[in-house]
Design a protein with these regions (language model features):
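Mid-domain alpha/beta scaffold segments of enzyme catalytic cores
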Residues: 1-267
Length: 267
C-alpha cells in the first residue's frame, strides 16, 4: 500500500468534483491507501478540510504558499476585496481548531505548504519570511509537522529553522543541490518529498529512510505520463522508478515510504 503525502485533489481550479471522485477510485485501485491534500492559501486550506471531511482516508493540512505571502504578484496587484491568502493569525488558528461536522470530521494533520520561494523577483521576500515564521509558530503551538516549499532560498531557510529545533517535517519536491540535500539530512530530521520530477531529472536521491512519496497532483506528472494531468494513482510509477533507481524491491519501497509517512503525519 502507498501514501500520497502531497497532492491538491481538492482544488476545483484543476479538478471537477466528478474528476476528483474518479481519481480517488483510480488511486485506490492502484494501491494508494491514503492521500494528503495540501493547503496553499487560507481559502484553499478550508477547501482541503472540506474534501477530507467527506472522504475516508483523505487528510488535509493548513498552509499558505510563499507566493501568497503578499498581495503583489508577477501579474500585478491582487483583486480587490477579502484576501483569503493573507488571513490573519486568528483566522489561521480558528481553522486549525474548528473542524466542520461531517462523515469523517478530521482535524488537520500538518501545516503546509509553507516556506520560501525566491525564484521570481515579484514575490516579497520579507513578507515570505514573516509569514513563514508565523506558520512555524502555528506548527509549534499545535505540535504539527510541516510540509516545506523551498526554492532558491536555502540559506534563509536553514537560518530560520535554527530557531525551531522542535519542528519536524518534509521538504516537498526537493530540486536543489547535493550540498543542500546533505545539509537537510545532516542538520535536520526532515524527510524529502520525491515526486514525478525525479523520474526525468538528475536530482540527487536521498536514502530510503528519509523519503516520502508524493505526486503534487495535478502538477509534476511522472514518466511515462508526462504531458497529461497528474493524479494520485501515479504514485505507483514513482515508487517503481525509485525501486529501480535504488536497486531495492518495490515491496520494500512501498513498505518503508508508507512507514515514513505514517510516522511523520500520525496516520
Amino acid at each position: 500500500m502507498l501514501i500520497d503525502s502531497h497532492c491538491h485533489l481538492h482544488d476545483r481550479e484543476f479538478f471537477t468534483a466528478e474528476q476528483a471522485e474518479e481519481m480517488l477510485e483510480h488511486a485506490r485501485k492502484n494501491g494508494v491507501e491514503k492521500i494528503i491534500c495540501i493547503g496553499t492559501s487560507h481559502e484553499d486550506s478550508l477547501a482541503a478540510r472540506e474534501f477530507a471531511n467527506t472522504h475516508e482516508n483523505v487528510y488535509w493540512t493548513y498552509g499558505i504558499h510563499p507566493e501568497n505571502a503578499t498581495e503583489i504578484s508577477l501579474s500585478g496587484p491582487r483583486p480587490a476585496g477579502p484576501s483569503p491568502w493573507a488571513a490573519g493569525a486568528n483566522s489561521r488558528a480558528a481553522a486549525l481548531r474548528n473542524t466542520p461536522t461531517g462523515t469523517f470530521s478530521v482535524a488537520p494533520i500538518g501545516i503546509g505548504e509553507v516556506g520560501l520561494d525566491y525564484h521570481y523577483d515579484g514575490y516579497d521576500r520579507d513578507a515570505q519570511i514573516k509569514l513563514f515564521r508565523e506558520m512555524l509558530d502555528l506548527a509549534k503551538e499545535y505540535d504539527l509537522p510541516v510540509s516545506f516549499h523551498v526554492r532558491e532560498a536555502y540559506d534563509d531557510f536553514f537560518e530560520i529553522i535554527k530557531d525551531y529545533p522542535e519542528i519536524r517535517g518534509v521538504v516537498h519536491s526537493f530540486t536543489d543541490s547535493k550540498k543542500n540535500l546533505k545539509r537537510i539530512l545532516n542538520e535536520t530530521n526532515f524527510y524529502i518529498g520525491v515526486n514525478g520530477l525525479a523520474t526525468y531529472s538528475t536530482l540527487p536521491t536521498p536514502p530510503l529512510e528519509r523519503i516520502l512519496l508524493e505526486t503534487d497532483a495535478p502538477f509534476l506528472t511522472p514518466v511515462p505520463f508526462r504531458g497529461i494531468i497528474n493524479e494520485c494513482a501515479y504514485i505507483r510509477n514513482i515508487a517503481e522508478w525509485l525501486s529501480e533507481k535504488l536497486g531495492i524491491d518495490l515491496e520494500i519501497i512501498e513498505k518503508e515510504t508508507t512507514k515514513n509517512a505514517r510516522k511523520l503525519f500520525g496516520i
